[in-house]
Regions:
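Short coil turns that delineate tetratricopeptide repeat
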Residues: 55, 89-90, 124, 158, ...
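Canonical tetratricopeptide repeat
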Residues: 63-66, 97-98, 132, 166, ...
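Alpha-helical segment of the N-proximal tetratricopeptide repeat
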Residues: 22-49, 53, 66, 70
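Start-of-helix register in tetratricopeptide repeats
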Residues: 25, 59, 93-94, 128, ...
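Alpha-helical linker/edge segments of TPR/alpha-solenoid repeat scaffolds
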Residues: 75, 105-110, 179-181, 193, ...
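Register position in tetratricopeptide repeats
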Residues: 36-37, 70-71, 105-106, 139-140, ...
């Protein structure tokens, strides 16, 4: 009996030691759980144990860098991202992303741009590298570079809401209003009810409502805002100004603000679609074709009500009597992709 009991204790001791040691994947998995609970120091301790087993584990080194970054210990975070990059095995593109972020938050945005550019030479299909490059470029007021990077980002992942949102801000900052509005519509279609939605929706409504400036020209006539450098889209911006002014027309007096919003949106999409003809370029192919098709398929009303759902119960009330319209739009939306 004593032999059996002793053997059992020995087995339990060995088994307990094996469990405490763990394999590299097990230690990393447990470390990630701790990281997700914001227990970063404890997570790093487990990752370090994994490195004691396999010091060349790219995953363990990357997770250590990630936890140090979360702790705002940027020196150590950078140290371990460089280890991952030097190992040149796995998680290299993620390490470049993290390294660029570290450089950005530590006041080295130009170095971050170099890091992203270097990474994109090796990983030209990494969407997040393009997005981070765009974000840093935007913050440096390098708007053309941001615009170019965001176009690449959306060609890889057209459902990346943040790229649509940042592209909208980039275009509006450059006074390219029509392009910015199109990107805002797409963002709101993807994120109709998030923390960013209210500001995006407010911006969209403001951009759709303006067009004729408050100031007047020397002749006393109202002037139309917009960027004349892009004549094609500038024409569409003039039409937006006309639409904004038409709200006071006798024929529109009994219409709700939501009805006018849907009508003006549909007109905007239609005008751009009819203007396109043989025009080429990212915005014409990616956005104009997409939203013109929505107008042609009679889905604009559904889109407009869907994207305002964060404001109040307007969408839910509309849905009560228009469910078939929303279902038809939803079916179309799941099948139709952007072109570029």
């Amino acid at each position: 009996m004593k032999k059996i009991f002793g053997s059992l204790l020995l087995f339990m001791s060995l088994n307990s030691g094996s469990f405490a040691q763990g394999t590299v994947p097990e230690l990393i998995a447990e470390g990630i759980k701790l990281h997700d609970k914001a227990m970063y120091a404890d997570a790093i301790e487990l990752y370090q144990k994994a490195l004691q087993i396999d010091k060349r584990s790219a995953r363990a080194n990357y997770e250590i860098a990630s936890s140090y970054f979360a702790m705002k210990d940027y020196i150590n975070a950078l140290k371990y991202t460089d280890i991952v990059i030097a190992l040149n095995v796995d998680y290299i593109d993620q390490a470049y992303l993290l390294k660029g972020s570290i450089q950005d938050v530590t006041g080295q945005p130009l170095e971050a741009l170099k890091t992203y550019a270097k990474a994109l030479q090796k990983y030209p299909n990494n969407q997040l590298l393009y997005y981070n490059l765009a974000l840093t470029s935007f913050n440096l007021k390098q708007y053309k570079d941001a615009e170019n990077a965001l176009q690449h980002s959306l060609k890889i992942d057209q459902l990346h809401a943040s790229s649509h949102f940042l592209l909208a801000l980039t275009m509006l900052t450059q006074e390219k209003r029509a392009q910015g509005i199109l990107a805002l519509y797409n963002f709101l279609l993807l994120e109709p009810n998030s923390k960013r939605t209210p500001s995006a929706l407010k911006t969209l409504e403001e951009e759709m409502a303006k067009g004729v400036q408050d100031k007047t020209s020397k002749s006393g006539a109202a002037t139309v805002s917009g960027n004349k450098d892009d004549d094609d889209f500038y024409t569409a911006e003039i039409m937006l100004g006309v639409l904004a002014s038409s709200k006071q027309n006798e024929s529109n007096k009994n219409k709700t603000a939501m009805q006018l919003f849907a009508e003006h949106t549909n007109y905007f999409f239609t005008i751009l679609g009819e203007m396109k003809k043989n025009k080429k370029g990212f915005f014409w192919n990616f956005y104009v074709d997409y939203f013109y098709t929505i107008a042609q398929k009679n889905h604009t009303e559904a889109l407009c009500y869907y994207i305002v759902q964060s404001k109040d119960d307007t969408y839910n009330k509309w849905l009560e009597t228009n469910l078939p319209k929303m279902e038809a739009f939803s079916e179309w939306y799941t099948k139709y992709l952007h072109k570029f």
